[in-house]
Amino acid sequence: MSAAAGKTLADYKAPYPKPTSRQRRYVILLDPKGDNAELNDYKVELIPGRVKLLDGANHYFLGGKIEEKTIDGWGYPYYVVTLAEMAGTAMLPLGNAAHKKLRFVPLHTSSLYRYNSKLPIVVYVPKDGVLRYRIWTAKLSGRGKAKSIKAKEM
């Protein structure tokens, strides 16, 4: 069982803002990896987006941004996501992929953030959005790997 599995945001006793009526708050609790490893070998990629009914051929993405803010007097970071409407698509021919299905459409750009198991990663996403994330690790061979995970709304 993960060391972070039983924790909640309240355990950190920090005054994170409540989500507005137009937001969802996601909290990512990370497993300890050791201070040196967390600083040098691990990163977190935040992947906000929306689930939309779309064809299966094209590659869609959203405009928007992730803004880092800080809890006054605490120095703890949190992130606020703004999602725009559909920013673009590859416009591939449809053929057999014309059938529409629900697909995750990510924010056009993504960034890597510090892996720090001592603090939660708190992300506010528009009500119609969802958050996914990846944990990136550096391997001695020089080839990194990532695992995509759905974030938990709290």
Curated annotation (Swiss-Prot):
Originating organism: Leishmania braziliensis
GO molecular function: serine-type endopeptidase inhibitor activity
InterPro entries tied to this protein: Ecotin_C, Ecotin_sf, Prot_inh_ecotin
Annotated protein name in UniProt: Ecotin-like protein 2
Family, as annotated: Belongs to the protease inhibitor I11 (ecotin) family.
Organism classification: Eukaryota, Discoba, Euglenozoa, Kinetoplastea, Metakinetoplastina
